[in-house]
From Swiss-Prot:
Keywords: Cell membrane, Cytoplasmic vesicle, Endosome, Lysosome, Membrane, Phosphoprotein, Synapse, Transmembrane, Transmembrane helix, Transport, Zinc. Its main location: membrane. It comes from Bos taurus (Bovine). The keyword Transport applies. The lineage of its organism: Eukaryota, Metazoa, Chordata, Craniata, Vertebrata. Homodimer. Interacts with MCOLN1/TRPML1. Interacts with SLC30A1, SLC30A2, SLC30A3 and SLC30A4. It is found in: Cytoplasmic vesicle, Secretory vesicle, Synaptic vesicle membrane; Early endosome membrane; Late endosome membrane; Lysosome membrane. This is Transmembrane protein 163. The chain crosses the membrane at residues 87-107, 115-135, 149-169, 186-206, 216-236, 254-274.
């Protein structure tokens, strides 16, 4: 009995505090800076910006190691498969655009067309740019080489500048002398054929460039796209001149516009790629 009474005396200190309900955290006694993160979860916009920042840092890290982003996207056999496709498209582009360049030069000389001359120069540029892409992907071990990629882009930028100067000078000369283009079936045939073929080549190069994350292939595709636009512009200016001889300046004006577009793209390409060539010059092991 004394033991029971003693246990009763020990268990009488005051009412017991009920435990917190299950599933609920204990209430904080005082609000402070430590409790603010729990009440303010990160916003979706902040999470998206964080992911973008991490992706950019990851790409920069790849470039610092001399690799393109395609090295993490493609398996080795997939990369080699797309490399071979890029080579085939480049060879096909060289053959087609070389034939179109000869035809366009013929039209330019015989029909006094500034747009035809501009297209012929752009076709020669397309041949050279496709040859550079061939060099870019000629080495199977350098399919992901950032240094090789940037060198190809710098060469393309220089070619763009030289070609644009020739196109603009020829177009301005034709405008100043008021040369009137002659219209015939041969001019129509060349313009339609060049417009269709160059547009198809541009789509193929853009697709391969996106998969291989290749700025050189995308630049080559841009050049083919310009060739397609110039081909259709020959058709447009000739058709307009046929119905209204007062609009004789349309042909030369299109030539000037396309020349300036190529010049701007070339300058942008050099500004972007020259520093990157210097940054990756230590990775010539891929050559």
């Amino acid at each position: 009995m004394e033991t029971a009474a003693g246990s009763e005396r020990r268990s009488t200190p005051g009412p017991a505090v009920p435990p917190p309900p299950r599933g609920h955290a204990p209430l904080a006694t005082a609000s402070g800076p430590l409790s603010s993160p729990a009440r303010e979860p990160p916003q979706p916009e902040e999470e998206r910006q964080l992911r973008i920042s991490e992706s950019g840092q990851f790409s920069d890290g790849l470039e610092d190691r001399g690799l393109l982003e395609s090295s993490t996207r493609l398996k080795p056999h997939e990369a080699q498969n797309y490399r071979k496709k890029a080579l085939w498209v480049s060879w096909f582009s060289i053959i087609v655009t070389l034939a179109l360049a000869v035809a366009a030069f013929t039209v330019s000389v015989m029909r006094y067309s500034a747009s035809a001359f501009g297209f012929a120069f752009d076709a020669i540029l397309d041949v050279l740019s496709s040859a550079i892409v061939l060099w870019r992907y000629s080495n199977a071990a350098a399919v992901h080489s950032a240094h090789r990629e940037y060198i190809a882009c710098v060469i393309l930028g220089v070619i763009f500048l030289l070609s644009s100067v020739c196109i603009v000078v020829k177009a301005i000369h034709d405008l100043s002398t008021k040369l009137l283009p002659e219209v015939d079936d041969f001019l129509f045939s060349v313009s339609i054929l060049s417009g269709i073929l160059c547009s198809i080549l541009a789509v193929l190069k853009f697709m391969l460039g996106k998969v291989l994350t290749s700025r050189a292939l995308i630049t080559d595709g841009f050049n083919s796209l310009v060739g397609g636009v110039m081909g259709f512009s020959i058709l447009l200016s000739a058709e307009v001149f046929k119905h209204n001889s007062a609009v004789w300046y349309l042909d030369g004006s299109i030539g000037v516009l396309i020349g300036l577009t190529i010049f701007a793209y070339g300058v942008k390409l050099l500004i972007d790629m020259v520093p990157r060539v210097r940054q990756t010059r230590h990775y010539e092991m891929f050559e």
